[in-house]
């Protein structure tokens, strides 16, 4: 299944706020009520919707999400927590979290167009897995710097998660540690996502 490119507001009306996909939110309380008045949900539908939240928020294809679930299952610790950590440490998500891009799709475009450096080297793979002590900067070109600056000014982050630091112009992001999952800005039950895939195999 390919990455979703359709109407974004349609997804947040059904699934709730997805800050990685769009900075828009359901317009009214009625929109949110409509989500809960569609009848009693089956256990399957609840698990499916949690999976869809994760997929659309991080901008993943179905195949990519399955791959991350498999990696998380093989790692030590809670599969759900490891899954979230893997997704949060993607380069496109780190850029979004730092405020260098206003959504994850916008961050992916920055990376694909070779505007981003990790530890002084161009990285053009949005799924690149960042690690502690990595330094994220823009390429030393006026256009690259302007794109980052405009995003930070237009959509300033009120508070950064404690695993990230953003230094002012020239903007530089530093990864301090692996994310603590309490900082994930998405209302999600990751265990239901793991259950969803466990029942599919």
Swiss-Prot record:
InterPro entries: Ribosomal_uS4, Ribosomal_uS4_bac-type, Ribosomal_uS4_CS, Ribosomal_uS4_N, S4_RNA-bd, S4_RNA-bd_sf. GO terms for cellular component: plastid; small ribosomal subunit. One of its GO terms (molecular function) is rRNA binding. The keyword Ribosomal protein applies. One of its GO terms (biological process) is translation. Keywords: Plastid, Ribonucleoprotein, Ribosomal protein, RNA-binding, rRNA-binding. Pfam families: Ribosomal_S4, S4. Signal peptide: none annotated. It is found in: Plastid. Its main location: plastid. SUPFAM superfamilies: Alpha-L RNA-binding motif. Residues 89-149 form the S4 RNA-binding domain. The keyword Protein biosynthesis does not apply. One of the primary rRNA binding proteins, it binds directly to 16S rRNA where it nucleates assembly of the body of the 30S subunit. Belongs to the universal ribosomal protein uS4 family. Part of the 30S ribosomal subunit. Contacts protein S5. The interaction surface between S4 and S5 is involved in control of translational fidelity. NCBIfam families: PRK05327.1, rpsD_bact. This is Small ribosomal subunit protein uS4c. It comes from Cuscuta reflexa. The gene is rps4.
């Amino acid at each position: 299944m390919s990455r979703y490119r359709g109407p974004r507001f349609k997804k947040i009306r059904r699934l709730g706020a997805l800050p990685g996909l769009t900075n828009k939110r359901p317009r009214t309380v009625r929109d949110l009520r409509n989500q809960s008045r569609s009848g009693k949900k089956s256990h399957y539908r609840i698990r499916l919707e949690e999976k869809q939240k994760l997929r659309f928020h991080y901008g993943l294809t179905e195949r990519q999400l399955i791959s991350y679930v498999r990696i998380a299952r093989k790692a030590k610790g809670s599969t759900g927590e490891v899954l979230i950590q893997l997704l949060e440490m993607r380069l496109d998500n780190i850029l979004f979290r730092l405020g260098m891009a206003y959504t994850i799709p916008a961050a992916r475009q920055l990376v694909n167009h070779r505007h981003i450096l990790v530890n002084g080297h161009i990285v053009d793979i949005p799924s690149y897995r960042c690690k502690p002590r990595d330094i994220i900067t823009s390429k030393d070109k006026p256009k690259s710097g302007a794109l980052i600056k405009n995003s930070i000014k237009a959509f300033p982050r009120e508070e950064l998660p404690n695993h990230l630091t953003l230094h002012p112009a020239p903007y530089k992001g530093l990864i301090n540690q692996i994310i603590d999952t309490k900082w994930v800005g998405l209302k999600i039950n990751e265990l239901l996502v793991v259950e969803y895939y466990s029942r599919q195999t």
